[in-house]
Every structure is written in C-alpha cells, then in structure tokens.
Amino acid sequence: GNAPNAAVTFARQGAEVSFISVVGDDPAGQTIVRVLDDEHINTSKVLIDKKLKSSFSTIMLAPSGERTILDYPGTAFLKDEHINFSNLDSDWLYVSSVGSMPLITKIMKRAHENGVNIAFNPASYELKNLQECADLLQYVTLFAVNKEEAKKFVDGNTIQELAAKLSESVKYTLVSDGPHGSVATDGLRLVTAGMYEDVPVIDRTGAGDAFTSGFVIKIAQGKSLEEAITFGSANSTSVVGAIGSKTNILKGNVKLHDMPLTITRI
C-alpha cells in the first residue's frame, strides 16, 4: 500500500526509516514485514494483531499498464491500541491512510506537538471525511494530492491555481495531474514539471506513491523544490517500467538528467 511504498523510497535514499502499522498473524502480514526488513526498514513498531487478517490487494493488470485493484481492507482500519504514541518522535512523519479520523487527528496533533514535520498524502477514506481532513492541515508541513483531490479543498482550474491556494494553509504543496505534469510550491514560488521521460508503461501501480515519496524525501533532505520535483518525477517514471510498485524504486546516488521546469512567483 501507500505507506510501504513510500517507506522503500525513503530507505533507498539513505533515510533511517521506521514503519508504524498493524498486520495480522498470517502469510500476508509476514510477507509485508519481510519485504520491509529486506529494505533495511525498522519494523519493530509494527504490531501483530492475531484477531485480524492483514490487508492485501489483488491487481489485475492490462497490457496498457492500467490496472484494477481489488482490495481487502483487513487491518487497514487502525485503532488507538494499535499505536504507541511515544513512537511519534522522528524528524518527519509520512501519513497516508489510517481509517479513523479521530485517530489520525490524534496522531498528527501529538506529532506536531513533538516538533515533527508531517507529510500528508490522504487516501479515499480521509477524502470522504472532507471537513475533518481539511482541519488536519493545521498540523501538516507538506500536503500532496492530485488535481481532482485538490479541487475538494480549494477552488481553481489549473494545478498552479490549486497549489497556490493550498499553500496558504501548508508550507509545501504538491499537486499532480498524471501525465499532464505536476506543480510544487513553498508558498513563494511555483515549480511546474512535465514528464521526466516518455517511457513504455508496464505497470502504473505505485507510480503516484513513488512521485510523492520521492518529492518528500528530497524536501526532508533539504533539497530545493526543483531537485525534489525532478527526483519525484524520475522515481515515478522508473516505477512504471516494471511490474510491481517497489521493483524499480530508485536507489541512492542515481544520476538524473535535467528536465524542463517552469518557475513562477506567487
């Protein structure tokens, strides 16, 4: 899912990563933990709940690279007892879906109080609870959504307009529009990017996660908007070239070429 995909990007870029979640005591849960362990991600904060079955997805892939995902939510709906709040003491916290608005609010509030930078990439559950989701932005450092999701929060026709308006609420905003490009802002400048490369698409699964997490890790490492959006775009481009959401996630010290960027001031 979103968070494991992001965790692998962070780890392959040299970050010290801990994964906080819950899995069932079953083959799917064991596989999740093993895959993360193999990527040198700390899984000591993963709770195994023997009463629940792990979340998993079945992906039906078309020759075009498009896919249909059949999802079994399982442990996706977290509860307070699944989270050790003393673990919320990192430099950055990447939050995707928690499956409970009261719990995600509690997590973000506690992390914010601890001085943690929060990157938030809401999933469908959070977006269905729009007002509560919008209220979370007071705790967020970096907010990442696609164009249609951004329109739920602010008015605007272009990704540039949407990002500029969202930047009034958070320090960094990232708005994507699939193959039509993306825009990032720090509240002062808008950096608009197109495609990194036009490559044959094998599997689009995880492309959005690769883009967002690639941007997040470079901002967390103190890189510029230009460097962050370039790396996110390159990471996404790499991922669609192979089957599997983690297979082609870029590793450290990869050499990237420049890509066309348009920079404007807000």
Where are these regions (language model features)?
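Histidine-anchored nucleotide/phosphate-binding helix
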Residues: 4-12, 107-110
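Anion (oxyanion) recognition and catalysis
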Residues: 11, 37, 112-113, 137, ...
